[in-house]
Amino acid sequence: FAIQSLVEAVQDSAQSPHQYTRPAGHPNLVTQLARRYSAHLRKEIDPFNEVAVTVGASQALYLSLQTLIKPGDEVVLFEPFFDLYVNQVKLAGGTPVFVPLTFVPYDESDENVVTGGEWILERSSLMEAVTTKTKAIILNSPHNPTGKIFTRDEMEFVAESLELADPECVVLSDEVYKYIVHSPPKERAPEESLFCRGHVHFASLPGMWERTLTISSAGKTFSATGWQVGWIVGPSHLVTRIHQLLPYVQFCASTVIQEALARSLPRADEPYQGHDSYYDYLREEYTRKRDLLADALRQSGFAVPDYDRTPGGGFFIFARIGKDIAESLPASRQFAPNVAAPGGIARQDWAMCQWMAEEHGFLCIPSSPFFSLERAQEGASDEFVRIAFCKTDETIMAAADALQRIARQASSPLAEDAELVS
């Protein structure tokens, strides 16, 4: 239906969607977004003063930081983090301050067995990082790269920390994956809000509307990242500052894409392919694909979260490299010079990803770019790789075959010799 909406918008000469539209957002789209967020946040949203439309969520974050941050200001990032955040903070003149999430394995009773686990935010770590220099905190839930869903308690820690920050400190809540909270067990399912099952909007917490800019986009929700339409929702005193900056960055996001999205949003609420809504279909489809990839990873010696214990979201698995897989990595590849790797050295995660791509045709992302350089060089990222499952079933099954080849090589005592001969 999103493609059909685009076709209709392209052909609708009466709406004239092929010309410039309002720089702060096409009227039809901001009206639809305001309607939706009014229901999400249980408050009336003004479409023309509390919504801004941007060229993707990345630009939404960039413009938010540009209006909030000046040289010397600090911005708190939860580590690991989406790698784009750090340089956007620096481009605004700010200083990133990293708060490590703590990885807690499910079981460490056998030192020879690597298990999955969960990432948690410790209140003390956050409180130590926030000072009167803190002008923004970037919160991303569901989280890229780990798939973590921040709990309500953890979000309340963030809200509490604002008491220690600059009085004008703002939380930038990156919620691009909010409709992709995987189907949790019923007893673990959090509150629901207009098809956002399992998702808590940070701005809905008591007193947080005035301190929050909520960022999202069409790309992840409608599997249309090339559409490049994002948005910001927040109080007028913050959003109108972004309105003032928008005409100097681009005149407007694509009018015809905005019109297509405005038509798609109400259609997404309707029954879709046997589900109550498109959003329910999306959630179940990604949960199914996640499980396909997770099973293949487990069978190949990687450790992944137990999703009955640890609800997840987004479309990545942050897998832990098993001991057999790690030992199969040729020693010549580890700590080898690599200009692309953080610090110019390929630690285990980087070397593993390069080896799997070059030798086995299996492509995933090393975890070190999601960590500060200091922590990556200390080895915090060595054990993890990020794998996407926003793929066709055929691609996931081909990945499973590649993982089996990797596992067979890992179980062979001649693994390193085979690499050297090749």
Model-inferred region functions:
Residues 67-89:
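Conserved PLP-anchoring active-site segment centered on the Schiff-base-forming lysine
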Residues 127, 346, 354-364, 368-422:
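PLP-dependent enzyme catalytic core of the Aspartate aminotransferase-like
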Residues 262, 278-294, 304-339, 380-381:
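Conserved glycine-rich beta-strand-loop-beta hairpin in the small C-terminal domain of fold type I
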Residues 101-196:
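Active-site phosphate-binding strand-loop segment of PLP-dependent enzymes
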